[in-house]
Amino acid sequence: QLSKQRKSDVMILVLAEAARNINIAAVRMRKHPNLEYIIVLGAHVEGTRLTKALLERTRRALQYLEENPETKAVLSGGKGDGESITEAQAMCNYLVEHGIDRERLILEEKSTNTTENLKFSLGMIGLNHSVGIVTNNFHVFRGTAIGKKCGCREIYPIPSRYRSWRLLIYIPREILAIIKDKLMGNM
């Protein structure tokens, strides 16, 4: 029988290996130009300000939209506790301030989690389009898998970087979310 310390050590090794695999998968993603839509998954907003995770996602969306002028973006995220505006509106404000035409932006402002982000966003645009999922590198596997489960036939990951000590929190949380979503049939 394993001691508590040994079990803890094994769990840390499993989480570290899973985190490494998630990041390797994100780094190896190919470029997918000229998609019809990208869906930018929301993350917490502090008042009206983009948090680091959401800022990185929004910057990646900006880069993609600048490189692909025919692509439209669905900005997905409702208004949570402590948020003065929806996550979608915060992303929209940033993108418009940085030169993206408002006509290219579609706001999905009711979702409260990743599954809702994708269900509601795909419900707005339909399932028969080429779609990129813009989210942080540690979150791209789950976001893309949920999009496929929602019925999107042509879906591609578009990871944004995220470098912070908070990865020590986010990656184990993401691994648990993957397990939960798999068990609940969301993936």
Give, region by region, the residue ranges found by the protein language model:
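A structural signal for short, hydrophobic/glycine-enriched beta-strand patches
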Residues: 19-171
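Hydrophobic alpha-helical topogenic segments used for membrane insertion/localization
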Residues: 9-19
